[in-house]
Regions:
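Cytosolic, low-complexity regulatory segments enriched in Ser/Pro/Gly with interspersed Lys/Arg
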Residues: 1-8
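Canonical BTB/POZ domain core
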Residues: 3, 14-101
Length: 101
């Protein structure tokens, strides 16, 4: 076996493990580094999750180098942001027909 021989490693349940890690980070309120402000509420999140899941948030965060930025969402309801974050972190969101529009 030569030192230049390469091995292929696979993490069989990678997607499930990452999804569970995202859920745990949010549920346990670990390492939050961004706040979204709407309807007089502050919702904590992770810049890496917002950036990976949304070009909108990625652009905002790229333009704001602050270690813990506040993103003000005027005209957006708390429940809407909560639904979006649930979708980003969990891959699912429960919405009423009215909320879909």
């Amino acid at each position: 076996m030569s030192s230049s021989e390469k091995f292929f490693l696979r993490w069989n349940d990678f997607e499930a493990s990452i999804s569970e890690a995202f859920r745990e980070l949010r549920e346990e309120k670990d390492f939050f580094d961004v706040s979204i402000v709407c309807d007089d509420f502050q919702i904590q999140a992770h810049k890496v999750i917002l950036s990976a899941c949304s070009p909108f948030f990625r652009t905002i965060l790229q333009c704001n180098p602050h270690p813990h930025p506040l993103i003000y969402m005027k005209g957006v309801e708390y429940k809407e942001i909560e639904n979006i974050l649930n979708f980003m972190y969990l891959g699912v969101a429960r919405l009423t027909h009215e909320e879909l529009s």
